[in-house]
Amino acid sequence: MKMFKQAILFAGILTAGALSAQSAQMNNMIKVGANVGLAVPSDNTSMAVGVDVAYQNLITPGFGLGIATGYTHYFGKENNGYDNNDVGVVPVGALIRIYPKQTGFYFGTDLGYGFLVGDDKVATNSTLDRPDGGFYIKPEIGYHNQSWNFFVQYQKVFVGSKGDLPNQDYNVGNIGAGFSYNIPLGK
């Protein structure tokens, strides 16, 4: 719970700073996108599909801050005799992006807290409770222009050893690819 409060405080500070520092040269946008990925490591899940929504404020032409959320669905799989349940991630975090040029290569990350949603148990044939969430990170690198972003990403919710079963680590993470469309909100 302490990490959750820190993540919310961090996101609030970044958002307040971005909103209070606006000038005529800043661009505001909503980013709406989708992604797909393969679970890594894949003890309890096989693949993931997700949607992303974010608000971004360009503090300078090459540096953006904002807030990000969305939903990623991880498909459970059978492993070591466990019939693992699907799990969803609802992240709440800060968005940080670096754009070296107006069009071309970019990189950045989302940092915050990932809420895990879905079945209460790790597996249908287990009594172990699913973790509620943990520290969330989503670094990405890709290509951008004024309207679109195309990227590869790593997405992970750190839950420690919560949800681990004998011979199986509980993991919520993937390596994938995605895109987002930028909806301009003005300067």
Can you say where each PLM-predicted feature lies in the sequence?
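Residues that define the transmembrane beta-barrel architecture of outer-membrane proteins
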Residues: N28-I30, T45-V49, D86-V92, P131-I137, ...
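Membrane-embedded beta-strand positions of outer-membrane beta-barrel proteins
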Residues: I30-V36, I67-T69, A94-I96, F107-L111, ...
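Predominantly the C-terminal beta-signal and adjacent terminal strand-loop region
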Residues: Y74-K77, F135-K187
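Cleavable N-terminal export/targeting peptides
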Residues: M1-N27, L185-K187
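Outer-membrane beta-barrel translocator domains and adjoining extracellular loop/strand segments
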Residues: S42-V49, K77-N85, V117-P131, G160-D169
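Transmembrane beta-strands of outer-membrane beta-barrel pores
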Residues: V36-V40, N57, T69-F75, P100-Q102, ...
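Glycine- and aromatic-enriched membrane insertion/assembly motifs of diderm outer-membrane
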Residues: P41-K101
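Short glycine/proline- and aromatic-enriched beta-strand/turn motifs that initiate or cap beta-hairpins
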Residues: A21-I59, L65, N174-G176, S180-K187
